[in-house]
UniProtKB/Swiss-Prot annotation:
Function: Inhibits basic phospholipase A2 isozymes PLA-B, BP-I and BP-II.
Stored PANTHER family: LY6/PLAUR DOMAIN-CONTAINING PROTEIN 8, LY6_PLAUR DOMAIN CONTAINING 9
Name recorded for this polypeptide: Phospholipase A2 inhibitor 1
Signal sequence coordinates: 1-19
SUPFAM superfamilies assigned: Snake toxin-like
Keyword annotations from UniProtKB, A to Z: Disulfide bond, Glycoprotein, Phospholipase A2 inhibitor, Secreted, Signal
Species in which this protein is naturally found: Protobothrops flavoviridis
Residues annotated as glycosylated: N176
GO MF term set: phospholipase A2 inhibitor activity
InterPro entries for the chain: CNF-like_PLA2_Inhibitor (IPR050918), LY6_UPA_recep-like (IPR016054), PLipase_A2-inh_b-type (IPR016338), PLipase_A2_inh_N (IPR004126), Snake_toxin-like_sf (IPR045860)
Length: 200
């Protein structure tokens, strides 16, 4: 399932982080087992991230443990409406010592369209995937556009992009370009006011 591959690779904030050692693993489901690896600045906090991609009655969750920067840890959570009743959601929990506690996924609110829309897309192996209209709901009045890549030993650089409606703009910094293995890098982070449908 392409969406499953996307969510496993999507988490654009996962990065290796000083001399602290943290668990490193990825898996489908609620937990994973991997190995300890040393962090390097500025990603010097241990953390656990849950990602969920949901579309209608189908939802898939993945877990990611790694070293994170303080800016990512402060993000705590995000919910992006990518259109077609589909969401990408994340819950981030960082801690001084392993194991980090979990954050729960509350159910999505039954929100109604609010008269705004954004370009929506979720792409893997491309930085410019086909856009469609994401109808914003509830408190979603911002458009998010994130582009990045992750370098793996095989198949190499994996580009990805994410666009959709969001309730507030996250404070994220661009990453320095590099080809270090098992790292994610942000190349573009744009957040602006959502577009408003013309009143009939």
């Amino acid at each position: 399932m392409k969406s499953l591959h996307i969510i496993c690779l999507l988490f654009i904030f996962v990065a290796r982080g000083n001399s602290r050692s943290c668990d490193f693993c990825h898996n489908i489901g609620a937990d994973c087992e991997g190995f300890q690896h040393e962090c390097s600045s500025p990603e010097d906090e241990c953390g656990k991230v849950f990602l969920e991609i949901s579309s209608a009655s189908l939802s898939v969750r993945t877990v990611h443990k790694n070293c994170f920067s303080s800016s990512v840890c402060k993000l705590r959570h995000f919910d992006v409406n990518i259109g077609h009743d589909s969401y990408i959601r994340g819950r981030i929990n960082c801690c001084e010592k392993e194991p980090c506690e979990d954050q729960s996924f509350p159910g999505l609110p039954l929100s109604q369209p609010n008269g705004y829309y954004c370009p929506g897309s979720l792409g893997l192996f491309t930085k410019d995937s086909t856009e469609f209209e994401a109808i914003c709901k509830g408190t979603e009045t911002k458009c998010i556009n994130i582009v990045g890549h992750r370098y793996e030993h095989y198949p190499g650089d994996i580009a990805y992009n994410l666009k959709g409606c969001i309730s507030s703009c996250p404070l994220l910094s661009l990453s320095n370009a590099t080809h270090e293995e098992n790292r994610n890098y942000l190349e573009k982070v744009e957040c602006k006011d959502a577009l408003q449908f013309e009143k009939q």
